[in-house]
């Protein structure tokens, strides 16, 4: 890994956050944490296969600004579960800029969960807990079922599958906020039955546009209100969810 110039990184981070109205989330301490996160992620990338994005400019835009943009949709002091957290996005950036949030990051891959947990400890993020768990198991567990104000997910599965993996975690009155790709509108239209069946209502797709160094990123966020309890028959085993999505 090529050495990252700290001053250059801080300058780029500050510029991108300012251009996208995110400056209020930065402080000297938080910039230090984003720098430390970047160094650790790129150092550990070969071992854990964390990210295909290794250029600093793209990391700042695609990983940091993108995840921090989610913050505006999360109320103060909320509980958040990041389903399929992977390398810790959005959970790690959110934990850095929102110490008021109580975040649980879950993934079925133990080595990635270990990476997220160790990184959170290194950065002093006491508001983030990482757990190795399959979402369909956690959604049935009394410890986690309907215990969170928000569920987040980034690039995990198509919406019919994702809804069954995430909505069971969300309290009535909470929301699922899914960070999706270019097929978001189509996925949302095909997931109407799944959303209604699982207790979701009022689905909307919002396109978030962010400006970086010579690049513009448009990222759809799908937001679903949880209005009714999820029936006890859901989530089903993953083989059923994937073979026969709702």
Regions found by a protein language model. Give the residues of each.
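Class I SAM-dependent transferase core
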Residues: 2-77, 81, 118-128
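Conserved beta-strand signature within the Rossmann-like core of class I S-adenosyl-L-methionine
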Residues: 173-183
């Amino acid at each position: 890994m090529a050495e990252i110039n700290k001053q250059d990184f801080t300058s780029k981070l500050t510029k991108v956050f300012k251009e996208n109205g995110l400056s209020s989330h930065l402080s000297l301490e938080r910039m230090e944490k984003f720098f430390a996160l970047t160094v650790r992620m790129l150092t550990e990338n070969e071992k854990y296969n964390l990210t295909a994005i290794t250029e600093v400019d793209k990391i700042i835009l695609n990983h940091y600004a993108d995840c921090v943009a989610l913050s505006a949709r999360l109320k103060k002091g909320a509980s958040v579960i990041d389903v399929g957290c992977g390398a810790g996005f959005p959970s790690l950036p959110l934990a850095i800029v929102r110490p008021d949030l109580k975040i649980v990051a879950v993934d079925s891959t133990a080595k990635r969960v270990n990476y997220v947990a160790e990184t959170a400890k290194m950065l002093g993020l006491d508001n983030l807990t990482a757990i190795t768990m399959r979402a369909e198991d956690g959604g049935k567990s009394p410890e986690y079922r309907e215990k969170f104000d928000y569920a987040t997910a980034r690039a995990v599965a198509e919406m019919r599958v994702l809804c069954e993996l995430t909505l069971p975690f969300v309290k009535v009155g909470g929301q699922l906020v899914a960070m999706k790709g270019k097929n978001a509108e189509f996925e949302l239209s095909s997931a109407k039955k799944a959303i209604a069946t699982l207790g979701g209502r009022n689905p909307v797709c919002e396109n978030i546009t962010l400006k970086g160094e010579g690049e513009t990123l448009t990222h759809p966020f799908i937001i679903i209100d949880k209005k009714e309890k999820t029936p006890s028959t859901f989530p089903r085993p993953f083989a059923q969810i994937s073979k026969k999505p709702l």
